[in-house]
UniProtKB/Swiss-Prot annotation:
Enzyme nomenclature, EC number: 2.5.1.78
Species whose genome carries this gene: Rhizorhabdus wittichii (strain DSM 6014 / CCUG 31198 / JCM 15750 / NBRC 105917 / EY 4224 / RW1) (Sphingomonas wittichii)
CDD domains xref list: Lumazine_synthase-I
Coiled coil: none
Chain's role: Catalyzes the formation of 6,7-dimethyl-8-ribityllumazine by condensation of 5-amino-6-(D-ribitylamino)uracil with 3,4-dihydroxy-2-butanone 4-phosphate. This is the penultimate step in the biosynthesis of riboflavin.
InterPro entries linked to this entry: LS, LS/RS, LS/RS_sf
Protein name (database record): 6,7-dimethyl-8-ribityllumazine synthase
Binding locations of (2S)-2-hydroxy-3-oxobutyl phosphate: E71, T72, R112
Pathways per UniProt: Cofactor biosynthesis; riboflavin biosynthesis; riboflavin from 2-hydroxy-3-oxobutyl phosphate and 5-amino-6-(D-ribitylamino)uracil: step 1/2
A family per Pfam: DMRL_synthase
Amino acid sequence: MAKLLIVEARFYDHLNDLLLDGARTAIEDAGHKHETITVPGALEVPGAIAMAAESGRYDGFVALGVVIRGETYHFEVVSNESARGLMALSMDSLAIGNGILTVENEAQALTRARRTEKDKGGEAAKAALRMMELREKFAG
């Protein structure tokens, strides 16, 4: 049984609740354990995963959050840099599922977060689980 860490950037509670429900359900349905921590925003997710990875206590990671486009360039910075940070960590053989939604509006976020629709939280957890399998396969 593996243990995953869900790292959530909790900014929109109702949207994060949906993502978290999907991720937890996918992990539990696969027979694994999980813990959840909260960070201030999407930019802090990669750093938290890097710190947790150093502990050696987790087999995989699920990144969750919602970034909704506003009126400034901040959306692009947060979206691009959080994704870049997660990608850099994955290149170090960390099994990470990226469930940080980058959307134009709340309606898009709801569609992607609901388990009955796109279930991006569940998909991120399944991606992390699959990457864990691949890492184990290549390790021998």
